[in-house]
A protein has these predicted regions:
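Flexible loop/turn connectors
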Residues: 215-318
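Alpha-helical recognition/docking segments in bacterial nutrient-uptake
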Residues: 49-52, 57-152, 156, 223
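Short beta-strand segments enriched in small/hydrophobic residues
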Residues: 3-8, 43-56, 153, 161-168
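Short helix-capping segments at alpha-helix termini
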Residues: 75-76, 185-195, 220-223, 245-251
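Hinge/beta->alpha junction and helix N-cap segments in small-molecule ligand-binding domains
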Residues: 37, 55-64, 82-91, 113-114, ...
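Short acidic capping loops at alpha-helix termini that bridge into adjacent secondary structure
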Residues: 160-161, 194-199, 226, 250-255
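N-terminal helix-turn-helix DNA-binding module of bacterial transcription factors
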Residues: 1-48, 318
Length: 318
């Protein structure tokens, strides 16, 4: 077996067959071999480290994403540096440049909601997650199809007065999810003589955003929705809190669907029905793209389908 084949196995290259991997790994275990990380870094001009820049450390979805990126990176023999831009475009650019100067092999970036481009003066390899930025490969869930699926599920239960808590208007994922909701609901609301715009409230993706939007949608005056599609699980949990405070039974009087599939959505009572993003697949794909070595342009993008997790917050309307 050639030195090159052994090197590819040690460095986690995907081109080696499973049979050869097994033989090399058995010999490595028998000899107690440990690769010289310093020598590898010197040869490659990098330090087998990846960077990750996210916009908000408080968002549970991003925490989950970081965990899965780190797991995949470790499987490939890499460590990870994490940083948060706090939704600041200037900070985002500074962090990417700083990570590049640290000789990371690439950076996974979840851009801030206001970002329309990514500054990359150091020329580091970039993969964008969860948003779409022109000229860069992106890895994301199919937000629009996931929202359509959520709205169609509520319609299948018999709901017609379905409201939507959208996200910030400048957020790519908010626009995509709202578009998916409107694909299903715009004609149905119009048929019912309801103005679609009056059944949509934009709010931050967090718990408080969901609470404040729910207060508007569940106000005492005018017709009320029998169901609410919240464009994030955090918003959906905020709706549950308002319903609890107002003694609105869920799902008896109001059905609620979220989006993301964060852990806490399966822990609250009642457990939230939600459109689940395949975060492990997204993280794995983004990490492998960075490490893979192929050209990184928009053609390398990947979109993953969402799946509905049917739990305890939905029922047919009374």
């Amino acid at each position: 077996m050639s030195v090159g084949t052994v090197s590819r196995v040690v460095n986690g290259h995907p081109s080696v067959t499973e049979a050869k991997k097994r033989i090399v790994n058995e010999v490595i275990a028998e000899l107690g071999f440990q690769p010289d990380v310093a020598a590898q870094s010197l040869r490659r001009g990098t330090n087998r480290t990846l960077g990750v820049v996210i916009p908000d450390l408080r968002n549970p979805f991003f925490a989950d994403l970081m965990q899965h990126i780190e797991l995949r990176a470790k499987e490939r023999g890499y460590s990870v540096l994490f940083a948060s831009s706090d939704e600041q475009v200037d900070s985002e650019a500074d962090l990417i440049a700083s990570l590049a100067r640290s000789k990371v092999e690439g950076v996974v970036v979840v851009p801030s909601n206001r970002a329309s481009s990514l500054a990359n003066p150091e020329g580091v390899r970039l993969v964008v997650v969860d948003r779409r930025i022109a000229g860069h490969p992106f890895v994301a869930a199919d937000h629009r199809a996931g929202a359509r699926m959520a709205a169609e599920y509520l319609v299948s239960l018999g709901h017609r007065r379905i409201a939507c808590i959208s996200g910030p208007e400048n957020a790519f994922v908010a626009r995509e999810r709202l578009a998916g909701f409107m694909d299903v609901m715009a004609p149905r609301l119009a048929e019912a003589g309801l103005d679609p715009a009056s059944w949509i409230v934009s709010a931050p993706f967090n718990y408080e955003g969901g609470r404040e939007a729910a207060k508007v949608l569940l106000a005492d005056d005018g017709p009320k929705p029998t169901a609410i599609f919240a464009c994030s699980d955090q918003q959906a949990i905020g709706v549950l809190r308002v319903a609890f405070d107002r003694r609105i039974a869920i799902p008896g009087e109001l059905s609620v669907v979220g989006f993301d599939g964060i852990l806490v959505s399966d822990l609250v009572v009642p457990r939230v029905t939600t459109a689940v993003q395949p975060v492990a697949s997204i993280a794995r794909c983004a990490t492998d793209l960075l490490i893979g070595g192929e050209a990184l342009d928009a053609s390398a993008s990947h979109i993953f389908p969402c799946a509905m997790a049917l739990r305890e917050t939905c029922a047919p309307p009374r």
